[in-house]
Amino acid sequence: MMKLRDLEFDFDISCPEDLERYLRCSEDMTQKAASAPPMPADVTSMDGLAAYKEWMTAYVKLLTDWIDGIFGDGACNKLLGPKTSLSAVLSLCDEIGEAAVQQGNAVGLQIRKYTPN
């Protein structure tokens, strides 16, 4: 189980199926990001702001789809609510990464416990 923001999800980075889903969703996100609009260099004009909104919308969708792909449909709404900002979803992605590292470290300790020197 992975605990994120007081919610528990049936996900364990040491479970082959869960790790496969994590890797597959990450690969899907990478492929979709290749066709996402580029981040505009200038956002000081109305056209620049419109381009920034398009870029931001695409990346929020990429990240929320990644989270829902890993933890199940609706997971992102449970974690962030229906109004999702880029900064909020990026913070959540950081939390997911930290939680996965913690799970991996816990398994590593168990492995070392039973591995001969």
Protein language model features and the residues they cover:
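Short N-terminal mixed-charge amphipathic segments
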Residues: 1-52
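Short acidic, glycine/proline-enriched loop segments that cap or flank alpha-helices
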Residues: 51-58, 80
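C-terminal charged interaction modules
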Residues: 74-117
